[in-house]
C-alpha cells in the first residue's frame, strides 16, 4: 500500500462523492485503472464537463487546450493541481504533497516524467498531452524483463512526433505493444507526408501505396524511414542497429525475417516485408499453399483448389451443438481429399468465441471429443489437431480461462489418452505464443485476419507458427466453386496424406448383405432369362429384403404390403 495513493483516493471520494458523473472508488492505497478513471472524471467535472467518462477523450483534451498549459507561472484551479499531484503519485513520482499548489516539487516531478518519456524539453509544464499521459497506467520506466532498446525507440518516437496533432505519448516500458505499434504506423504516415487530418495509425491503402522500398547502402537523410524500418525489425525480435543506415547486418536480419515469414528472401525492405512486420495479415494478397474451409471438399472443389495452387486443406472434426451449420468432415470426404492429392489437417471448434467457454473441465471434454472424432475419421497418431480460441482473448482471460483450458486438453490428450495426437492452437498471435511457451501447444494456427485484435496488434508471429490465416477468397466456378480462408504455411505442419481405414461397426452385417445380394443377383439373372425381361436389379433388391424379413415379417398379414416371399430363393440363400 502507498500512503500517498491512499491519500489521493480519500481526497477524491471526499471531494466528489455524490456528484453526478463521479463513481466512488475503494480506498486501498493501490494504483489501478479505477483510481485513474476517478481522477479522469474529477478532471472532467473541474473542466465543466457534465457527461463524464472513464475515457480521456477529445472533449477533455479541447477543454484543457482552452485552459492552457499548467505550470508554476499559471493560476490553475487548486483541485486540478491536486489531480495532477495525485496522478503523479499513482505513476510513482513525488510532487511533494497533495497541496493544490503547483510548486517546485510538482514541476520537478513532471520534468522527471518528461525525461522518462524521452522528451528533450523537460520544462515541468503540464500540456494537454502530458495530462493525458498522467491519467493512464502506462509506464515510462523500463519494466522487468523488457528491452532497453525497445524503450529507447519508444522515447525517440515520443520526442520526434509528439507535436503532431494525433500522436500521443506511448509507454516507454520496453515492451512492444498495441500502442507502440500504432505509434509506429503514425510515424510512417508522417514521414510519407500525410497531414494530421489523414494520418490515423492504420496501415491502410494510402499508407501502403506510399511505403518506400529500402535497400542496402541507403541512409536516412531527408526522412526517417530506415529508422522506422529498423524499429519494426527490433519490435519483431530482430537485433539490428537503430541508426538509420541500411547496412549489411540489417540486410542479413531482413533475410532471416523473410525466411521466417515465408517471404522472398531478397534482403530488401519491400512492401511485403513492411506489411509482415506491421500487421498480422502481412500482404493479404499473398497466395498461400494451405487453406481451411467450412464447406465440404468434393472432387470438383478439390480440383479447383489444386488448380489454384493449394496443397493442404483444413477441415472441422465436429459441428457446433445447436447450430444448423454443417461444417464437419462429411462421409467419404477425406478419401476424396487425399485421392485428389491434397493433404488435410483437422480443426476442433464447437464454439470457443467467448471467455466463458474456456476452463479446465471444458478443455478435458474438448480433448475427448476431438480424440473420438479424429479416431472415427481415421487420423493417424501424431496428427496435429488445432483447438480454436476464436475471439480476442487478452489480460485476465489468458491466465484465468485459456491456459487452464489447454491444461485440461493436455491432461487428457497427453496423459490419459497417451499422446496419440499433437495439440495445436488456433488463436490470435499473442494467445498462440503464451499457450505454446507454456508447453501446452506444439504448433500455432494464427487467426491473422483479425488485424485489430489486441492479441494480434503489437505482437510478432509465434515462433511455432504452422499456418497463418490472412484472407478469405473464393476459388473455382460452377460445381467447383468454394469459399476458403487463404493460409500461409510455414512447413512445420503439412497436414497428413494418409489416414487409417476405419472398420465399420456394422462390418459383419454389411458383409452378410454383400453375400445375400450376390446370391440374389444370380437368382434374379436366372429369373430374367426365364421370364423375358424381369428387371434383374429391382428383383435382386426385393429378394434381399425378403430374406431379411423371413423370420419375423411373414404370413398372410404381410402379403398385401410386402408381397410373397420366394421360397426357392430363400432356400438358395440359406444354403449359401
Curated annotation (Swiss-Prot):
Family matches, as Pfam families: PG_binding_1, Rv2525c_GlyHyd-like
Induction field: Repressed by FadR in the absence of LCFAs (fatty acids of 14-20 carbon atoms). When LCFAs are present in the medium, they are converted to long-chain acyl-CoAs, which antagonize FadR as to its binding to fadR boxes on target DNA and thus derepress transcription.
InterPro entries hit by this protein: Glycoside_hydrolase_SF, Peptidoglycan-bd-like, PGBD-like_sf, PGBDSf, Rv2525c-like_Glyco_Hydro-like
Source species, domain of life: Bacteria
Family listed: Belongs to the FadG family.
Name by which UniProt lists this protein: Uncharacterized protein FadG
Organism encoding this protein: Bacillus subtilis (strain 168)
Amino acid at each position: 500500500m502507498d500512503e500517498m495513493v491512499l491519500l489521493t483516493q480519500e481526497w477524491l471520494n471526499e471531494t466528489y462523492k455524490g456528484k453526478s458523473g463521479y463513481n466512488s472508488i475503494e480506498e486501498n492505497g493501490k494504483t489501478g485503472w479505477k483510481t485513474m478513471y476517478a481522477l479522469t472524471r474529477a478532471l472532467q467535472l473541474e473542466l465543466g464537463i457534465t457527461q463524464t467518462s472513464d475515457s480521456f477523450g477529445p472533449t477533455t483534451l479541447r477543454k484543457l487546450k482552452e485552459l492552457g498549459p499548467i505550470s508554476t507561472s499559471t493560476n490553475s484551479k487548486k483541485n486540478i493541481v491536486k489531480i495532477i499531484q495525485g496522478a503523479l503519485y499513482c505513476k510513482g513520482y513525488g510532487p511533494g504533497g497533495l497541496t493544490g499548489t503547483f510548486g517546485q516539487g510538482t514541476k520537478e516531478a513532471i520534468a522527471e516524467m518528461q525525461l522518462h518519456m524521452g522528451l528533450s524539453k523537460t520544462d515541468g509544464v503540464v500540456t494537454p498531452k502530458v495530462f493525458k499521459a498522467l491519467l493512464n497506467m502506462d509506464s515510462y520506466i523500463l519494466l522487468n524483463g523488457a528491452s532497453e532498446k525497445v524503450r529507447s525507440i519508444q522515447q525517440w518516437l515520443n520526442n520526434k512526433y509528439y507535436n503532431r496533432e494525433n500522436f500521443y505519448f506511448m509507454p516507454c516500458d520496453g515492451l512492444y505493444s498495441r500502442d507502440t505499434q500504432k505509434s509506429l504506423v503514425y510515424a510512417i504516415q508522417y514521414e510519407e507526408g500525410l497531414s494530421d487530418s489523414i494520418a490515423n495509425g492504420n496501415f491502410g491503402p494510402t499508407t501502403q501505396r506510399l511505403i518506400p522500398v529500402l535497400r542496402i547502402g541507403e541512409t536516412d537523410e531527408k526522412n526517417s524511414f530506415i529508422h522506422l524500418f529498423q524499429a519494426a525489425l527490433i519490435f519483431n525480435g530482430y537485433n539490428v542497429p537503430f541508426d538509420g543506415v541500411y547496412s549489411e547486418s540489417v540486410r542479413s536480419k531482413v533475410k532471416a525475417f523473410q525466411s521466417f515469414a515465408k517471404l522472398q528472401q531478397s534482403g530488401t525492405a519491400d512492401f511485403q516485408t513492411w506489411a509482415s512486420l506491421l500487421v498480422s495479415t502481412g500482404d493479404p494478397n499473398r497466395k498461400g499453399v494451405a487453406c481451411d474451409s467450412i464447406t465440404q471438399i468434393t472432387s470438383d472443389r478439390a480440383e479447383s483448389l489444386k488448380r489454384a495452387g493449394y496443397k493442404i486443406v483444413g477441415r472441422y472434426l465436429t459441428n457446433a451443438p445447436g447450430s444448423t451449420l454443417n461444417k464437419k468432415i462429411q462421409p467419404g470426404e477425406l478419401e476424396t481429399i487425399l485421392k485428389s492429392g491434397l493433404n488435410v489437417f483437422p480443426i476442433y471448434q464447437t464454439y470457443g468465441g467467448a471467455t466463458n467457454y474456456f476452463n479446465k473441465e471444458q478443455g478435458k471434454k474438448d480433448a475427448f471429443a476431438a480424440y473420438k472424432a479424429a479416431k472415427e475419421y481415421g487420423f493417424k497418431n501424431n496428427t496435429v489437431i488445432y483447438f480454436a480460441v476464436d475471439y480476442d482473448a487478452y489480460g485476465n482471460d489468458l491466465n484465468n480461462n485459456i491456459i487452464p483450458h489447454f491444461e485440461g486438453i493436455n491432461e487428457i490428450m497427453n496423459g490419459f489418452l497417451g499422446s496419440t495426437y499433437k495439440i495445436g492452437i488456433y488463436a490470435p498471435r499473442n494467445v498462440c505464443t503464451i499457450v505454446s511457451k507454456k508447453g501446452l501447444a506444439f504448433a500455432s494456427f494464427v487467426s491473422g485476419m483479425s488485424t485489430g485484435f489486441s492479441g494480434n496488434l503489437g505482437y510478432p508471429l509465434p515462433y511455432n507458427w504452422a499456418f497463418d490465416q490472412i484472407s478469405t477468397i473464393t476459388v473455382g466456378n460452377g460445381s467447383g466453386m468454394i469459399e476458403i480462408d487463404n493460409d500461409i504455411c510455414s512447413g512445420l505442419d503439412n497436414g497428413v496424406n494418409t489416414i487409417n481405414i476405419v472398420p465399420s461397426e456394422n462390418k459383419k452385417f454389411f458383409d452378410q448383405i454383400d453375400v445375400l445380394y450376390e446370391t440374389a443377383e444370380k437368382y434374379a439373372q436366372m429369373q430374367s432369362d426365364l421370364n423375358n425381361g424381369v428387371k434383374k436389379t429391382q428383383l435382386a433388391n426385393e429378394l434381399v429384403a425378403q430374406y431379411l424379413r423371413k423370420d419375423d415379417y411373414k404370413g398372410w398379414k404381410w402379403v398385401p404390403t410386402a408381397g410373397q416371399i420366394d421360397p426357392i430363393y430363400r432356400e438358395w440363400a440359406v444354403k449359401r
